[in-house]
Amino acid sequence: MKLLVDAGNSRIKWWVPECQAHGVVDRLALDDLAGEIAAVIDISKLSSVRVSCVAGKSIETQLRGELGFARDLDVKFARVSSPLPILTVAYREIHRLGVDRWLAMLAVREKFPDRFCAVLDAGSAVTVDFVTEAGVHEGGMIVPGVQTMARALWSNTSDVAVERLELVPRWCPGVDTYDCVRQGVSALYTGLVNEVHSYIDGSAERHLSPAIVVTGGDRHWFTQAFSSPVVVDPHLVLKGLLVLDELEK
């Protein structure tokens, strides 16, 4: 069995495809990860561990120790490479592309091999990547995530303390500080969604309709914000690790 792990900036998700076991821990509870996995599966049956980590080198070092389960398991960290048979990266310096974005694109390409794709990840940052029907990454956009943007505003507003910002489907003028912030941030992201639509509409004529795929912790708001049908998949990075494993066999 193979263990797949997605270590993000706030949470760590894991998945064992062969038995469909999965779970999530807070990144600050990293010491609990191995124990949680061992409580659900028979770790003696694990043959390999594949990891996506965007949380920094120190977390990567901790993960390598935790996920070896004291069995000298090969813990392999995904690194961006290009070209691959299904995806060619647009970045001139490919190592500067976030491995999570790359893996998400691999997963989407596997699912929609003949369609133009827009991949939106609404996490601590909101990223959008565009991939042609031929598997050519055209580039993308990065803006602060919903909660990241909210924290930046709260830090300069001493009379407002909110743990989590909830966006609105359609913005209108706010009537207090909190409401003004959520209305304003909602309007900003509405503009982002409109630009994604415009870019897709302005691209070359296609035989199949484009695929818009949304993932990340704040995916629900973005799902309803698009006027076109959207595919929601909260596990794109984990699925991308599985695709990468197959490509490298």
UniProtKB/Swiss-Prot annotation:
InterPro entries: ATPase_NBD, Type_III_PanK. One of its GO terms (cellular component) is cytoplasm. The keyword Kinase applies. Pfam families: Pan_kinase. Pathway: Cofactor biosynthesis; coenzyme A biosynthesis; CoA from (R)-pantothenate: step 1/5. Catalyzes the phosphorylation of pantothenate (Pan), the first step in CoA biosynthesis. Belongs to the type III pantothenate kinase family. This is Type III pantothenate kinase. It comes from Teredinibacter turnerae (strain ATCC 39867 / T7901). The lineage of its organism: Bacteria, Pseudomonadati, Pseudomonadota, Gammaproteobacteria, Cellvibrionales. The gene is coaX.
